């Protein structure tokens, strides 16, 4: 999710130039469709590269957040060593296949929804500047989450499994089992509310922070922080190391604000996999249980240090890849 939001934030800070009118059939509408297709591909590729880079950290985060009994007494780095010892090296990438399937539509929906909401907020409500980026980013993030939530649910279930204790043999089997045993279609949306409540500040703050840092940086120090885009010399883009810094700051702030909702969401998604399932049926009950049994630092914010460690490499790969893809697909 973070990677797609990072790439979307980059697109938000650099809106595409107006498309020229094309003569004959397949004019401006076709060209605009091609723009969204290119955005879809650019965002999907960037998201997949970033998520694959930090997949081992994502796996450990799920295990620590939900207090898996094999690893609940371990920290981040000791868990990174313990997982390969127990499950092999590929154990660090368990659930990543489902994430790759999810990240492409997630990125596409987020890009299109952001542009739509940004235009709607500007034209209908008369709100512009950084505020409309904050609002549109929050709404786009929530829209993308709702549309792709079942895939994230399955990914979490697969990531939580430990070798020798598999409830699901793969993505399709997980879908079938959840549908059959956990209330049909609604079983795929357990934990949606805390996810939405967490996504609103996460996506909004990510868009707002990165967009603000980028616009201020390129306005006040264009030579030091920026360079001409390879596909359009008239457009300035951030240098790679500056992208890393801005993305890291945006991600760290957004994660800190939304992390308790992320912990709550993971526990609700895991559902019957956890022994305390009946105590975590609602968002309120889940937060109360986690806080009561584990406190704030070891409960609601357990694994946050891992998210901070994930933030810099994830944002670096996402922004760098997306910058390259924007130039490759002529999006500047």
Swiss-Prot record:
It is found in: Mitochondrion inner membrane. It is a multi-pass membrane protein. Keywords: Membrane, Mitochondrion, Mitochondrion inner membrane, Repeat, Transmembrane, Transmembrane helix, Transport. Solcar repeats lie at residues 34-120, 128-216, 238-328. One of its GO terms (biological process) is mitochondrial coenzyme A transmembrane transport. It holds the Pfam family Mito_carr. Its main location: mitochondrion. One of its GO terms (cellular component) is mitochondrion. Disulfide bonds: none annotated. GO terms for molecular function: antiporter activity; coenzyme A transmembrane transporter activity. The keyword Transferase does not apply. The chain crosses the membrane at residues 37-57, 88-108, 134-154, 191-211, 244-264, 299-319. Belongs to the mitochondrial carrier (TC 2.A.29) family. May be involved in the transport of coenzyme A in the mitochondrial matrix. Very little is known about the physiological function of this carrier. This is Solute carrier family 25 member 16. It comes from Homo sapiens. The gene is SLC25A16.
């Amino acid at each position: 999710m973070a990677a797609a939001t990072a790439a979307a934030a980059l697109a938000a800070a650099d809106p595409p130039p107006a498309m020229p009118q094309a003569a004959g059939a397949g004019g401006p509408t076709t060209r605009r469709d091609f723009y969204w297709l290119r955005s879809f591909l650019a965002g999907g590729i960037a998201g997949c590269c970033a998520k694959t880079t930090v997949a081992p950290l994502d796996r450990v985060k799920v295990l620590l957040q939900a207090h898996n009994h094999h690893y609940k007494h371990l920290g981040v780095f000791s868990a990174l060593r313990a997982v390969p010892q127990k499950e092999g090296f590929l154990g660090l990438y368990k659930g990543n296949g489902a994430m790759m399937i999810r990240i492409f539509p997630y990125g596409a929906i987020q890009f299109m929804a952001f542009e739509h909401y940004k235009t709607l907020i500007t034209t209908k409500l008369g709100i512009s500047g950084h505020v409309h980026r904050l609002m549109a980013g929050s709404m786009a993030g929530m829209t993308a989450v709702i549309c792709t939530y079942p895939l994230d649910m399955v990914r979490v279930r697969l990531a939580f499994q430990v070798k020798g204790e598999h409830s699901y043999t793969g993505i399709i089997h997980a879908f079938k089992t959840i549908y059959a045993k956990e209330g049909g279609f609604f079983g795929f949306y357990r934990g949606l509310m805390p996810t939405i409540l967490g996504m609103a500040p996460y996506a909004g703050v990510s868009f707002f922070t990165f967009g603000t840092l980028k616009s201020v940086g390129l306005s006040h120090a264009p030579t030091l922080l920026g360079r001409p885009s390879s596909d359009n010399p008239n457009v300035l883009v951030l240098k790679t190391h500056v992208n890393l810094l801005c993305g890291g700051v945006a991600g760290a702030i957004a994660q800190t604000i939304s992390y308790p909702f992320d912990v709550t969401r993971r526990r609700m998604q895991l559902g019957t996999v956890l022994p305390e399932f009946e105590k975590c049926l609602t968002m309120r009950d889940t937060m109360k249980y986690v806080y009561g049994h584990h406190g704030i630092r070891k409960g609601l914010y357990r694994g946050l240090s891992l998210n901070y460690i994930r933030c810099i490499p994830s944002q670096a790969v996402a922004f760098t890849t997306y910058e390259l893809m924007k130039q490759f697909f002529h999006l500047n």
